[in-house]
């Protein structure tokens, strides 16, 4: 059974996290553990962007960004999926350079060293050469860089619909099943 870590950096794009968590709860039969790490800045951004910060409604284990006693700080805990959404370029840089100075970068390091699924949903734009090289390094190490770029062939009508095109893709990349629009065959 899947054990999932959702990490929330301080980048703008809290709606992506909210939609992901809502969808993960809707497919609970596909996972046995959901653990969430939210940085202090992510809490502020969430409140600013969404007007709320009630994370307690999600059936999950919550960890502070410096809690290195979290089970997924060790590879022996067998967490097999980590989604960082949104993933700031600062977080990308720390992961790419092996700096395990907080729980998010430590967990990502563990996921990569154990050859498990790391998905970094980057939202910032444009990219400079340092960003591109850091994303390349993570990709070469086995991670997946998934820009938060909505698709429009499904004709989304709302921001939430557009966000769902990205989130559904992330869920699919994680190896989980979700009903979503796909290109007609």
Predicted segments with their positions:
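A cross-family phosphate/adenosyl-ligand binding-site feature
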Residues: 1-119, 123-185
């Amino acid at each position: 059974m899947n054990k999932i870590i959702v990490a929330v950096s301080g980048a703008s794009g809290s709606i992506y996290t909210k939609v992901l968590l809502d969808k993960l709860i809707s497919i609970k039969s596909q996972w046995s553990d959901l653990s969430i790490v939210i940085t202090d800045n992510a809490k502020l951004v969430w409140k600013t962007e969404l007007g709320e910060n009630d994370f307690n409604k999600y059936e999950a284990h919550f960890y502070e960004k410096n809690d290195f006693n979290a089970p997924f700080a060790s590879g022996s805990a067998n967490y097999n999926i980590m989604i960082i959404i949104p993933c700031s370029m600062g977080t990308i840089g720390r992961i790419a350079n092996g700096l395990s100075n907080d729980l998010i970068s430590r967990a990502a390091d563990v996921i990569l060293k154990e050859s498990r699924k790391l998905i970094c949903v980057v939202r910032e734009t444009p990219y400079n050469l340092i960003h591109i090289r850091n994303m390349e390094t993570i990709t070469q190490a086995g991670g997946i860089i998934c820009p938060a770029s909505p698709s429009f062939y499904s004709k989304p009508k709302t921001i939430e619909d557009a966000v769902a095109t990205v989130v559904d893709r992330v869920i699919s990349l994680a190896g989980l099943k979700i009903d979503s629009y796909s290109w007609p065959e």
